[in-house]
């Protein structure tokens, strides 16, 4: 944990999770009494946990929005998201000179296996390859949103 304080789960914050289903309610606070701000409609979307209670996770999404979701709609499986309007090349190896196996379309998701030395190994069906870590959302080690910020749309 960056500040050394224990979390309710014992896991580090920030950390990456994905949304389990294509219908996840984003709330203003950590509880069913809080207003639903919007609904996520994309299963496997990577989001960053920036704070938590025992039952609720405060998340930062690819658009910089902050909201609370219940722990049961979160998964520890990893994916990355092409947040840009350009295709991201999926290479055979960890160099830009290696063969391009596929292209990740803008605003697309792909499963993440691991990241090392600035490259992330990704997979979709039988295809496996490497993308540059800086080209996708879902790998950053630092908090992307301020945990003290109230829930609401991105500020950018």
What residue ranges belong to the model's regions?
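SH3-family beta-barrel domains
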Residues: 1-28, 39-43, 50-53, 60-65, ...
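Short boundary/loop segments of OB/S1/cold-shock single-stranded nucleic-acid-binding domains
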Residues: 32-37
């Amino acid at each position: 944990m960056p500040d050394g304080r224990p979390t309710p789960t014992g896991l580090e914050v920030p950390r990456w999770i994905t949304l389990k289903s294509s219908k996840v309610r984003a709330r203003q606070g950590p509880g069913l009494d809080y207003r639903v701000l919007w609904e996520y409609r994309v299963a496997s979307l990577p989001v960053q946990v920036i704070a938590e209670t025992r039952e609720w996770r405060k998340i930062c999404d690819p658009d910089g929005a902050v909201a609370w979701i219940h722990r049961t709609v979160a998964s520890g499986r990893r994916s990355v998201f092409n947040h840009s309007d350009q295709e991201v090349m999926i290479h055979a190896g960890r160099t830009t000179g290696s063969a391009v196996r596929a292209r990740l379309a803008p605003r697309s998701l792909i499963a993440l296996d691991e990241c090392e030395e600035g490259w992330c190994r990704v997979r979709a069906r039988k295809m496996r390859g490497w993308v540059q870590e800086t080209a996708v959302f879902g790998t950053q080690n630092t908090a992307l949103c301020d945990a003290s910020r109230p829930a609401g749309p991105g500020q950018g």
